């Protein structure tokens, strides 16, 4: 038996050495060769607003510049696109193997029968197709290993994008790009009439439910072609050339292409006719893409999409990657606003400075004027400190999911929100947005938030409006009359972001919640009388908070439970050692934490006392008086 164990042990060691040795040998062999040459083919029209980012991120690619050549064309532009391209070439053109460019600043700004710069007329299709065919010919002439067809709407934020794509050695591959919506640069389905077809696989790839490189019927906008593949000579964007190629391959018994003279569809069908697979790769977060505009759209809509993309970069990457120094003066952020509210607070833990910085980056990109509010840190609380504050817990409370008592993190979270309610009353702030520091904003947040607020003010009195939450799916939530973006809120988790009125703050303080404490996201549904636990609700006699919710929601958590990067300071903190009728209490898995600032103990006690005294004025107040 022992001899067998020794034998198998030696066998495993030998196998490991062989595999590891092969990997090392392969790596050494690869290091002996130059990276493949890449021709970047770029067509530009009216892209001055995005070119500084596009060119900066392209230049920042971790790929030898002497192995990259450019083929650039810019025409029919009425903005500063040509000037920006010339500026970039002046600074960086000599870094690359070669640059072939042609800029037409004297020609017409529009195409025949064009209704707007975003209209794709027949003449525009013909012109673009001819240019792409020219780029293909040039790539063959200079013996490029790859040609990378790029639109200027592509922002390759991953510096490993080009190196990763070329290493795949696929005949045709596109990096999967993110947008403000579900739009991307690939299709997973195509109808017999060459239209886009919805599939379940599309979302799986887009949301990276599965990771890798996947065969698809269509890629566009950012497409890398291996020019050394035998079938590459048959790839084309031209409809007539595709038909000619198909006719010359009659032995394949293929019907001639009868579809539209659309460059991306023709390219996909030419690959299909030649038996060349198209792939999309989502192994990296390669970057972002702007959605194409329709003929009736405006430049302002493109700028708004770019703002949304920059906000997504902050949420995904922590900050917008910087542009080249000489382009920095061209990067503008919107003027900051309070969304027609009196104030906006963001609750943040002092020991989470990275979250604060990320949120401040986000506010800068979106244009929000927000005050940082130091959170009460559960790690600085203990049972003695809690008792000194006069805090008592609701008898019988236990967390609905984990069946445990409250944690110090949850206590700190409640006190943080409570302090803002007190501040509102002190300063007589009529409407306030309260944000936590682990959120991402939905696209067009500013405009949608103002619309929701105006609807609420015009059609109904309110105390609280959820901007972000997790609703109980079974709960019925009727629409607010005469409003298309508001519902009457049902039982909800999380306090990611909500608008609170002064009247609402007074109602919450009047309930004296520190005398029967429960987590803040359980307390709020109790106060608008939609909590399913009637034992808890019975402890709060007056439950007349008027609570609404934006529909759809306007903000979401950055991470959900179980996802990479998810941290909960409320759930992972120490539990209280206080007896309740049911013994234990618990935490919600998807709620984030809040914390306490050193040196604020005295201020906190004063505010707690003031909150209790202020709550006594509530019965004499009406909505009209406030």
Curated annotation (Swiss-Prot):
It is an enzyme of class 2 (transferase). The keyword Cell wall biogenesis/degradation does not apply. A motif (Prevents secretion from ER) lies at residues 623-626. Residues 1-21 form the signal peptide. One of its GO terms (molecular function) is procollagen galactosyltransferase activity. Its EC number is 2.-.-.-. This is Glycosyltransferase 25 family member. SUPFAM superfamilies: Nucleotide-diphospho-sugar transferases. GO terms for cellular component: endoplasmic reticulum lumen. Glycans are attached at residues 113, 234, 272, 533. Pfam families: Glyco_transf_25. It comes from Drosophila pseudoobscura pseudoobscura. Belongs to the glycosyltransferase 25 family. Keywords: Endoplasmic reticulum, Glycoprotein, Glycosyltransferase, Signal, Transferase. Its main location: endoplasmic reticulum. It is found in: Endoplasmic reticulum lumen. The keyword Cytoplasm does not apply.
């Amino acid at each position: 038996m022992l001899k067998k164990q020794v034998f198998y042990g030696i066998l495993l060691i030998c196998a490991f050495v062989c595999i590891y040795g092969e990997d090392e040998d392969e790596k050494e062999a690869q290091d002996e060769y130059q990276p493949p040459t890449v021709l970047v083919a770029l067509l530009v029209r009216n892209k001055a607003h995005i070119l500084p980012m596009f060119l900066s991120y392209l230049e920042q690619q971790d790929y030898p510049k002497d192995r990259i050549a450019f083929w650039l064309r810019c025409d029919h532009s009425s903005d500063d696109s040509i000037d920006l391209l010339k500026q970039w070439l002046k600074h960086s053109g000599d870094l690359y193997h070669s640059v072939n460019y042609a800029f037409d600043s004297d020609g017409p700004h529009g195409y025949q029968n064009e209704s707007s710069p975003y209209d794709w007329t027949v003449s525009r299709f013909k012109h673009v197709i001819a240019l792409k065919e020219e780029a293909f010919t040039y790539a063959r002439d200079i013996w490029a290993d790859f040609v990378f067809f790029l639109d200027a709407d592509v922002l390759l934020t991953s510096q490993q994008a080009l190196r990763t794509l070329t290493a795949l050695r696929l005949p045709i591959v596109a990096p999967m790009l993110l947008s403000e919506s579900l739009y991307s640069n690939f299709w997973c389905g195509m109808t017999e009439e060459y239209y886009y077809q919805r599939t379940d696989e599309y979302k799986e790839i887009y949301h990276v439910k599965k990771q890798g490189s996947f065969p698809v019927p269509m890629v566009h906008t950012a497409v890398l072609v291996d020019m050394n593949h035998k079938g590459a000579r048959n790839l084309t964007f031209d409809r007539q050339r595709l038909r000619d190629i198909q006719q010359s391959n009659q032995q394949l018994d293929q019907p001639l292409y009868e579809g539209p003279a659309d460059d991306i569809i023709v390219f996909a069908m030419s690959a299909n006719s030649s038996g060349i697979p198209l792939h999309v790769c989502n192994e990296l977060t390669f970057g972002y893409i702007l959605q194409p505009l329709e003929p009736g759209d405006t430049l302002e809509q493109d700028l708004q999409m770019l703002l949304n993309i920059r906000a997504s970069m902050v949420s995904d990457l922590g900050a917008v990657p910087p542009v080249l120094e000489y382009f920095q003066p061209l990067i503008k952020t919107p003027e900051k606003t309070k969304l027609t509210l009196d104030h906006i607070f963001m609750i943040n833990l002092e020991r989470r400075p990275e979250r604060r910085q990320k949120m401040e980056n986000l506010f800068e990109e979106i244009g929000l004027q927000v005050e940082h509010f130091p959170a009460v840190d559960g790690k600085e609380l203990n049972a003695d400190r809690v008792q000194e504050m006069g805090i008592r817990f609701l008898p019988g409370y236990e967390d609905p999911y984990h069946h445990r008592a409250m944690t110090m993190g949850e206590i700190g979270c409640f006190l943080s929100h409570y302090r803002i309610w007190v501040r509102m009353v002190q300063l007589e702030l009529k409407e306030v947005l309260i944000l936590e520091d682990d959120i991402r904003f939905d696209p067009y947040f500013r405009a949608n938030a103002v619309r929701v607020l105006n609807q609420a003010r015009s059609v109904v009195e309110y105390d609280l409006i959820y901007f972000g939450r997790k609703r109980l799916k079974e709960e019925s939530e009727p629409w607010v009359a005469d409003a298309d973006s508001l519902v009457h809120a049902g039982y909800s988790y999380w306090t990611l972001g909500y608008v609170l009125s002064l009247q609402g703050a007074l109602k919450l303080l009047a309930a004296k919640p520190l005398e029967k404490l429960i987590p803040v996201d359980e307390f709020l549904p109790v106060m608008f009388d939609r909590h399913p636990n009637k034992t808890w609700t019975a402890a709060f006699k007056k439950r007349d908070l008027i609570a609404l919710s934006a529909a759809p929601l306007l903000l979401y958590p950055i991470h959900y439970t179980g996802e990479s990067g998810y941290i909960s300071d409320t759930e992972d903190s120490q539990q209280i050692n206080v007896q309740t009728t049911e013994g234990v209490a618990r935490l919600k898995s998807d709620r984030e934490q809040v914390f306490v600032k050193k040196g604020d103990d005295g201020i906190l006690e004063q505010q707690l006392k003031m909150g209790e005294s202020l709550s006594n004025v509530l019965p004499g107040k009406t909505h009209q008086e406030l």
